[in-house]
From Swiss-Prot:
Keywords (A to Z) from UniProt: Ribonucleoprotein, Ribosomal protein, RNA-binding, rRNA-binding
Protein name (record): Large ribosomal subunit protein bL25
GO cellular component entries: cytosolic large ribosomal subunit
An example Gene Ontology biological process: translation
Length: 92
């Protein structure tokens, strides 16, 4: 599986809310020797694939033209809506 991710320049609660209203959600890619990277992902693309078992294995994020192999580490969901609020990915 391969997903496009955009590096976030604005961080914080307000920026995250604007992302969610635009149909995206914030995420963090960390682990390995590289520094953590804050990214934004398309909500519908991710949610449609989350039901598949392959999603929780190795997936590829394309961040600024560079492919990064990651694995979902943590998913924060909305309390009663079928929405993802935030995700953490760990580099493989």
């Amino acid at each position: 599986m391969k997903f496009e991710a955009v590096v976030r320049t604005e961080l914080g609660k307000g920026a995250s809310r604007r992302l969610r209203l635009a149909g995206q959600f914030p995420a963090v890619v960390y682990g390995g020797e590289a520094a953590p990277v804050a990214v934004a992902l398309n909500h519908d693309d991710i949610v449609n694939q989350m039901d598949k078992p392959e999603f929780y294995e190795a997936i590829t994020l394309v961040i600024g033209g560079e492919e990064v192999k990651v694995k979902p580490q943590d998913v924060q969901r909305h309390a009663f809506k079928p929405k993802v609020e935030h995700m953490d990915f760990i580099r493989i």
